[in-house]
């Protein structure tokens, strides 16, 4: 076990079961002068492992505004995170995690599929109390119902 990076190399479009191309992953939209959250962090579950350390089930989601601009129905990642923490409250943890993710996203000029996963990896590395990750499940569903305006964005 250990902290392994979240990879997007074999990311599949859940709607078509096709591998998402590198070119598509590099498409991004500006997010640098916006005060809204770019990536939402949700704590799905908190429990303790056999050594009495806190284990978290986390969910990351690209917020609706940017999914819509990128013609993405869903972009997210779930994972189980093992920590060095002995105890924590759900509310303080949620607040801490979201603030940390917001700080990382505030340094971005643009957001897209690739940057979404870069930000999650940076987030995990910045939390020194995270010991390991497992059951990492990235998910992406592209929007296929209309012609896309997504090619007018930053590449």
Curated annotation (Swiss-Prot):
Top-level lineage group: Viruses
Similarity section: Belongs to the nanovirus U1 protein family.
Protein name: Protein U1
Organism of provenance: Faba bean necrotic yellows virus (isolate Syrian SV292-88) (FBNYV)
Gene: DNA-U1
């Amino acid at each position: 076990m250990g902290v392994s990076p979240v990879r997007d190399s074999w990311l599949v479009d859940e709607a078509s079961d096709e591998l998402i191309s590198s070119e598509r992953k590099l498409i991004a939209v500006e997010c640098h002068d916006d005060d809204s959250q770019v990536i939402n962090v949700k704590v799905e579950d908190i429990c303790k492992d056999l050594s009495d350390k806190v284990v978290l089930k986390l969910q990351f989601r690209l917020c609706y505004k940017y999914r819509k601009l990128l013609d993405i129905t869903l972009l997210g990642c779930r994972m189980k995170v093992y920590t060095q923490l002995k105890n924590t409250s759900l509310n303080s943890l949620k607040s801490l995690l979201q603030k940390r993710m917001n700080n990382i996203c505030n340094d971005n000029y643009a957001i897209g599929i690739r940057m979404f996963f870069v930000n999650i990896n940076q987030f995990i590395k910045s939390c020194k109390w995270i010991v390991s990750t497992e059951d990492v499940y990235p998910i992406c569903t592209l929007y296929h119902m209309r012609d896309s305006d997504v090619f007018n964005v930053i590449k």
